[in-house]
């Protein structure tokens, strides 16, 4: 009665994430409300500006605050952690502006520490792969639309179904830049896997399929930003 889980649903989020959240809440007896996140309708969002995440988070948390107040609650919390402090995270500005709590950051917990504590508590999500919305796969300034979001979603699902543990398919025009864990690069370039991935991604709409030799890392689209932009 004291907690409501609010889950966003939109074309920027894979259906698998929504289904996993629903299953978790149902299994643990948590009241869940699913809210439509309509970020593609936000003025300027589709143009993918550098403050894209701010635009989305501000709109989403305004909706969540409305739900909280309708249910007699006076607090809203989100799940960022200390690792998020080291990257460009304009969404955290919206968190601060709207008075949303960040308990994991306030406790100064890193992602690794959260995983360790989750494992000790027996939570099935302790080793869940990191996830960020599909809009974060687009190079800044490239138009975001439903078709390309679908291309990214299908490409990442393919890689997960093939047994890769942490994946990103970054989109540069009609070029796919694949990131997998460094330890899985050897696997992805095996002839059978390489040809299957290239064939499928071209089927999904990509013209070229490339592999990032640095491997998976969070926020790789921010590597082209100047330090002064990141500090804003």
Question: Which stretches of residues belong to each language-model region?
Answer:
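Short, conserved beta-strand edge motifs with alternating hydrophobic and charged residues
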Residues: 76-79, 133-135, 168-170, 179
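Mid-to-C-terminal catalytic subdomains of enzymes
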Residues: 105-109, 115-159, 166-168
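ATP-dependent adenylation/nucleotidyltransferase module used to activate substrates
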Residues: 1-120, 161, 176, 192, ...
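Peripheral terminal appendages
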Residues: 1-4, 153-232
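Residue-level detector of family-conserved "landmark" positions at structurally sensitive sites
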Residues: 6, 35, 78, 128, ...
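A short, flexible beta-alpha/helix-coil linker loop
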Residues: 40, 139-141, 183-185
């Amino acid at each position: 009665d004291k907690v409501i889980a609010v889950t966003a649903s939109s074309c920027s989020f894979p259906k698998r994430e929504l289904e996993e959240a629903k299953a978790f809440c149902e299994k643990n007896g948590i009241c869940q409300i699913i809210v439509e996140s309509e970020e593609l309708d936000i003025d300027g969002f589709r143009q993918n500006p550098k403050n894209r995440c701010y635009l989305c988070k501000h709109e989403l948390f305004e909706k969540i605050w409305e739900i909280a107040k309708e249910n007699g609650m006076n607090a809203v919390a989100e799940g960022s952690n200390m690792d998020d402090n080291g990257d460009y995270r304009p969404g955290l500005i919206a968190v601060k502006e709207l008075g949303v709590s960040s308990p994991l950051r306030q406790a100064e917990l890193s992602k690794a520490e959260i995983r360790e504590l989750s494992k000790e508590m027996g939570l099935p999500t302790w080793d869940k792969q990191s996830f960020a919305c599909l809009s974060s796969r687009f190079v800044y300034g490239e138009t975001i639309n439903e078709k390309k979001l679908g291309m990214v979603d299908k490409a990442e699902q393919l890689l997960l179904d093939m047994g890769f543990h942490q994946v990103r398919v970054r989109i540069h025009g009609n070029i796919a830049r694949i990131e997998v864990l460094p330890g899985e690069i050897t696997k992805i370039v095996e002839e059978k896997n390489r040809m299957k991935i290239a064939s499928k991604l071209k089927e999904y709409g990509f013209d070229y399929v490339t592999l990032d030799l640095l491997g998976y890392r969070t926020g790789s689209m921010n590597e082209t930003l100047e330090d002064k932009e990141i500090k804003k």
